[in-house]
């Protein structure tokens, strides 16, 4: 049965035209987002950001739904809103591509988060356009997360990852966690001097799928062999048992400074990550197919079980007939 799923996945991949990630489009999204200005959770600016994201998704033929909640932070209570857009596939099991669209709250300087908060949202918008035109064996979900950033100056305790924690808890409650098979998290990928290291918190096979794709694309100069430990929006998914990988460039000199502007990022970096993610996707789908039973199918017990069960039933009948 599993082999049949793998064959079906490969067949869909074979008839799908090559999907092209357009960094020019992604860059225009990034330019528009940065032009809004600082976009911290709960601000009027993040409302404008949500409208832009929803409008662009609609232009690509995708509808966005909102996950809204009140988050109690160490600083204040904030209304937060994550956006979800679904691209139906041949099966209901889904791969989630996620990234945050909020920027860190700073009052000392103007922080527009070109890479940190901007690049992930811009990337997901372009990825959505590409995957909408693709025949997807599994359902694809685009998740624009609010509340990744800490409200206090430092990342500490639960003052962070508000959106991802809320999403996972909601998925547990409504049962949709069962169909969530993998998370690919995109964060801070705009750096002109792009250096992405392996994350030791991420799921090894999923990490390998990304790094192997980078090597096949001759882009392994950007996806480095060394590793580091990263705390990010993938942690709640990992804690819930969802295979997850974080694609992030932490070696970014402009991180959490006023210099995180368009001057510090490049369309080339967006293109590199887009090419690698799209090259890795078929391999991720095939790997997941190997672990899944057919939709609606019952798992078959081994023949030996039926033979043993038949013997047991026969013995029970004989005992009953003998008056035992």
Predicted segments — roles?
Residues 16-20, 34-47, 71-74, 107-118, ...:
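Second-shell loop/turn segments in exported
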Residues 30, 34-41, 57-64, 87, ...:
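Sec/Tat-exported extracytoplasmic proteins
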Residues 108-209, 226-229, 234:
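Acidic/histidine-rich catalytic neighborhood of metal-dependent amide-processing enzymes
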Residues 45, 68-70, 182, 189-306, ...:
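Active-site-adjacent substrate-binding region
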Residues 6-17:
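Hydrophobic h-region of N-terminal signal peptides that target proteins for export
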Residues 33, 67-69, 87-89, 98-102, ...:
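Active-site-proximal beta-strand/loop segments in catalytic clefts of secreted hydrolases
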Residues 28-90:
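A non-catalytic alpha/beta surface segment that caps or lines the substrate-entry region
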Residues 60-62, 91-95, 136-141, 178-182, ...:
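Loop/turn elements at helix/coil->beta-strand transitions in domains of secreted/extracellular proteins
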């Amino acid at each position: 049965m599993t082999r049949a799923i793998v064959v079906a996945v490969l067949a869909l991949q074979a008839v799908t035209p090559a999907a092209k990630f357009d960094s020019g489009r992604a860059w225009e999204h990034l330019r528009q987002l940065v032009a809004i200005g600082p976009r911290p959770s709960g601000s009027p600016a993040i409302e404008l950001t949500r409208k832009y994201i929803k409008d662009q998704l609609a232009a690509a033929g995708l509808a966005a739904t909102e996950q809204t909640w009140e988050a109690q932070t160490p600083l204040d209570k904030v209304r937060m809103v994550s956006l979800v857009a679904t691209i139906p596939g041949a099966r209901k099991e889904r791969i989630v591509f996620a990234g945050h669209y909020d920027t860190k709250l700073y009052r000392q300087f103007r922080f527009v988060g070109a890479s940190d908060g901007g690049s992930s949202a811009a990337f997901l918008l372009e990825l959505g356009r590409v995957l909408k035109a693709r025949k997807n064996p599994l359902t694809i979900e685009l998740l624009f997360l609010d509340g990744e950033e800490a409200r206090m100056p430092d990342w500490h305790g639960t003052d962070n990852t508000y959106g991802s924690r809320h999403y996972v808890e909601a998925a547990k409650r409504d049962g949709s966690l069962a169909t969530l098979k993998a998370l690919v998290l995109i964060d801070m990928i705009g750096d002109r001097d792009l250096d992405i290291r392996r994350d030791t918190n991420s799921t090894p096979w999923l990490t390998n799928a990304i790094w192997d794709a980078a090597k096949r694309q001759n882009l392994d100069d950007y996806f480095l062999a060394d590793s580091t430990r990263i705390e990010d929006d993938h942690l709640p998914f990992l804690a819930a048992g969802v295979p997850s990988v974080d694609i992030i460039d932490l070696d970014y000199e402009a991180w959490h400074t006023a210099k995180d502007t368009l001057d510090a990022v490049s369309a080339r970096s967006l293109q590199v990550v887009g090419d690698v993610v799209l090259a890795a996707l078929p391999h991720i789908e095939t790997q997941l197919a190997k672990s899944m039973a057919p939709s609606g199918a019952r798992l078959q017990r081994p023949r030996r079980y039926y033979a043993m069960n038949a013997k047991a039933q026969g013995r029970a009948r004989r005992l009953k007939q003998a008056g035992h």
